[in-house]
Every structure is written in structure tokens, then in C-alpha cells.
Curated annotation (Swiss-Prot):
One of its GO terms (biological process) is heart jogging. It is found in: Nucleus. One of its GO terms (cellular component) is extracellular region. Belongs to the FOXJ1 family. Induction: By hedgehog signaling in the floor plate. In response to injury and stretch. Key transcription factor required for motile ciliogenesis. Activates genes essential for motile cilia formation and function. Its activity is sufficient for ectopic development of cilia that resemble motile cilia. CDD domains: FH_FOXJ1. This is Forkhead box protein J1-A. Residues 68-78 have a biased composition (Polar residues). It comes from the Eukaryota. Its main location: nucleus.
Length: 458
């Protein structure tokens, strides 16, 4: 059970806390009124930076003002204005904006860090923008301009069409204090820019002009761009493409994508597939491997002889070529209609071996060729007048050779009848005579008058 006596120490503790806070505030005031020399001495003795661990910033809260009722002295405000550092860590924190803070006083750590920040020769330490920097009097800040821009500024300030290298050096050192105190290697960079940059042109000195060295001027072609700062980093402007050309390229790219997605089939391939399906549906007993090989050979021969079909159209007596492929043309299918159907080849072969099947009986398997007109060296020959030549011509044409010519025909006809028969009564055959014996023939091998011996034999 809790008693009221257990709650009595709480107010007493709160009073003791207020006394400690007041004591700390009094000590802080004594530190503020002390001289900076004492602060530096204490820092040298301690040689520690307590800006992160010090709790002296607690005195800046309003609770201290409510308890003590004291106000800051004008001297503290002068120290704050002279130092660009915040009075406390919370005063410089953006997250503390809007908090009820009193005009603070700099802490010991922040008060002693002011000389270190003010000694840094940088824009951040001084809190100035580049436009507010006086480059003529500030030797610590380098001008934010490229060497090409500095050369162009010197040429524009001279009010002359051409300027010497020494004048460029003089103008840069007069207007920018940084280059007066910097290492003189920047002059080499100026010379390299004049020699390598295409914006500057070297003008030779005339003979009657006094002085030494040549002159330099800005190329009129690049003068406007250089003055506008386009060549500050030597970057060319982006290439402008005609809108019409952009639209055309975009349309071509879309068309290419559509073509790549859709497979195109030529009409020849479609017709070949259609013929193949018709032939396979008409004949059910065809060999797929044979059909595939035949299709390939027909395709190759069709592409190879496409240019040679035209010159032979005027020739007569041409017989269509027979093919073992199921891909038959319509006229061939009509001529060979009697061969359609399923045949028992084993039974046919057995009948032929037994003599039961006669190939001479019945209708012929192939259609009878019609009488055709023959032209040899411009002379008309009817089939009745030249039966042998007509037979040779038909056999030669059935062999499938489309390159048949007259020389082949004449040679074949000559072999059929190389010479005409001579009447045997007008010519004596010595070797073929049956009256001469073998002994008489051997007698001819011995010496003597051969002519007399032959006459006796005859």
C-alpha cells in the first residue's frame, strides 16, 4: 500500500534540480564574461573538443530565462554577429526551426572555433556566392572560367581585331589576382589553347609592324558560340535532325518489326504445296523418301533450267518427260489413267515367269505417238519416206534430252545404214570364198611370186 510519504521526495528532488540548473547557468555567465585568451588557454590545457559531449547548450532554453530572469548582454550579440557560427547545435539545425528559442549566446566550443573557420580561403567558409567575389583582389579563389573563355574575354576587352600573347597574359593578371600569385604554369595552358583550339586563328606579323611574335584573333565562324559559352568545355551542340527524317526512320523501323514478326510465303511455295497434297491424295502407295528426293530434284532442276526453257519452245515433236514422282502434271495423269490403282506386283511377276502373261497382248501401256512432221536441213520428210529416221528421232526424244540437234540425228541415221550393199556378182570375195583351203593360205607365207600364187587361187 502506497503512502503519502513516498511521494514527498519528488518535490524535493525537483527543487534540487532547479538549484543545479541555476548553478550551471551562473557558471556559464562567468565563462561568457571571461576573455578569449582564457578560453584559448583552457583549450590548450585540455586539448579536447567537447562540442559533441558538452551540455552547455541546455542554458539556451526558455526554462533558464524563466528561472533566472536574466538577459544576455550586448557584448554577446556582438560576438554572435562577428562569428558566422550558430550559437548552439540546435540553432544551426534545420529541424529546430519553429522551436521557442531565445537569442542565444555562443558556447565555449563554438566561440573558440570561429578563428579556424575564418582562416579557410574558400567560398563555403566565407559564405559568399561566386558572383559576390572580387577576383581582382582575392588571391585565394580561382575564377570559374576556362582558359578559352579567359582568352576570349581578353580579346573582347582589347577592342582590337588581333592581340598578342603578352597582352593576353597582362589582361588576365590585371583582372584576376589569383593568376598573379599562382604558379606560372597556367601560361602554358593559355598557349596550348591558342594552338589547339579551332576557335582561335594565328595572324602573322607584317614586316612593317614593330615588335616580335604573331597575333591571335577569334575565328568569325565560332565567335558567337564562344562568346555565349558554348565552348567552355569544348562540347559541340547536339545535332538537330529534320522532323520529316525522324518520322520516316520511325516508320521504317515499325515496318521492319512487322515483317520480322510475320512470315512471308511466296506464291510458288504455296502452289508447290498444293500440287504435293493433290498428288499424295491421289496415290496412297507412294514412298515418302522417294517423293522428298524427287521434290528436291525438281526444285533444283526448275531453278537451273528456268532460263533455258524459252529457246526450245519452237521445236516440234517434243515428248513430255516421264517422272516416277507422285507429283504428276495433269496431262500426264490423263495419259496414264490406265496405270492408276493398286497392283499386285508379286502376282504379275509370277505370271511373267510362268509364261502366263503376254506383254504383246492388250492395249499398250503408253499412248501411241502421233505422226509428226520432220524437218532436216530445210527439207520436209514424211514418216512414210523415212521410217528409220523417224524411229531414231522418236527414240532419241523419248530419252528426255531437250538439247537434241540435227548432228545427233544424222550420226544416228548413219550408224543404222553406214553404206549401201554392193552386188556380189560384180565383186570377188577372196577371204570369204569356200574354195580356198587352209593349206593354200599357208603357202602364201613362203617366198615366191605372190601375185602368181594369188592368180592360181582365184
Amino acid at each position: 500500500m502506497l503512502s503519502m510519504s513516498s511521494m514527498d521526495p519528488w518535490p524535493e528532488g525537483s527543487v534540487g534540480l532547479e538549484e543545479e540548473v541555476v548553478t550551471a547557468a551562473a557558471q556559464a555567465e562567468r565563462l561568457d564574461t571571461s576573455t578569449p585568451l582564457q578560453c584559448n588557454t583552457s583549450l590548450d590545457s585540455d586539448n579536447l573538443d567537447d562540442s559533441l559531449t558538452s551540455l552547455q547548450w541546455l542554458q539556451e532554453f526558455s526554462i533558464l530565462n524563466a528561472s533566472t530572469g536574466q538577459h544576455t548582454s550586448p557584448s554577446s550579440h556582438s560576438h554572435l554577429m562577428g562569428s558566422d557560427a550558430p550559437s548552439s547545435p540546435l540553432a544551426g539545425d534545420p529541424a529546430s526551426i519553429g522551436m521557442p528559442l531565445t537569442p542565444g549566446k555562443p558556447t565555449a566550443a563554438s566561440f573558440c572555433r570561429v578563428p579556424m573557420f575564418s582562416a579557410l580561403p574558400s567560398l563555403v567558409a566565407h559564405g559568399h556566392c561566386p558572383d559576390e567575389v572580387d577576383y581582382k583582389s582575392n588571391p585565394h579563389i580561382k575564377p570559374p572560367y576556362s582558359y578559352a573563355t579567359l582568352i576570349c574575354m581578353a580579346m573582347q576587352a582589347s577592342k582590337k581585331t588581333k592581340i598578342t600573347l603578352s597582352c593576353i597574359y597582362k589582361w588576365i593578371t590585371d583582372n584576376f589576382c589569383y593568376f598573379r600569385h599562382a604558379d606560372p604554369t597556367w601560361q602554358n595552358s593559355i598557349r596550348h589553347n591558342l594552338s589547339l583550339n579551332k576557335c582561335f586563328i594565328k595572324v602573322p606579323r607584317q614586316k612593317d609592324e614593330p615588335g616580335k611574335g604573331g597575333f591571335w584573333k577569334i575565328d568569325p565562324q565560332y565567335a558567337e558560340r564562344l562568346l555565349n559559352g558554348a565552348y567552355k568545355k569544348r562540347r559541340l551542340p547536339p545535332v538537330q535532325i529534320n522532323p520529316a527524317l525522324q518520322h520516316r526512320l520511325r516508320m521504317n523501323a515499325q515496318a521492319t518489326g512487322v515483317i520480322s514478326r510475320n512470315l512471308s510465303v511466296s506464291p510458288e511455295s504455296q502452289q508447290l504445296l498444293k500440287d504435293f497434297e493433290e498428288a499424295t491424295s491421289a496415290d496412297q502407295n507412294w514412298d515418302p523418301r522417294l517423293a522428298e528426293a524427287t521434290m528436291l530434284s525438281c526444285w533444283i532442276s526448275g531453278k537451273g533450267t528456268n532460263k533455258r526453257k524459252q529457246p526450245y519452245n519452237h521445236r516440234t515433236g517434243k515428248t513430255p518427260r516421264r517422272s516416277s514422282s507422285p507429283l504428276l502434271v495433269m496431262d500426264e495423269q490423263e495419259d496414264l489413267s490406265s496405270l492408276r490403282g493398286n497392283f499386285d506386283w508379286d502376282a504379275l511377276l509370277d505370271s511373267a515367269l510362268n509364261g502366263e502373261l503376254s506383254l504383246n497382248e492388250g492395249s499398250p501401256l503408253s499412248p501411241t505417238p502421233q505422226d509428226e512432221e520432220l524437218m532436216i536441213r530445210g527439207t520436209h520428210i514424211s514418216p512414210q519416206e523415212a521410217p528409220v529416221e523417224n524411229h531414231v528421232l522418236m527414240e532419241t526424244q523419248r530419252s528426255g534430252d531437250e538439247d537434241f540437234d540435227e548432228e545427233t540425228f544424222l550420226a544416228t541415221a548413219f550408224l543404222q545404214s553406214p553404206w549401201s550393199e554392193v552386188d556380189e556378182s560384180n565383186r570377188s570375195d577372196f577371204l570369204g570364198s569356200s574354195t580356198v583351203s587352209i593349206d593354200q593360205l599357208f603357202d602364201l607365207s613362203f617366198g615366191g611370186d605372190l601375185s602368181s600364187k594369188i592368180e592360181t587361187l582365184l
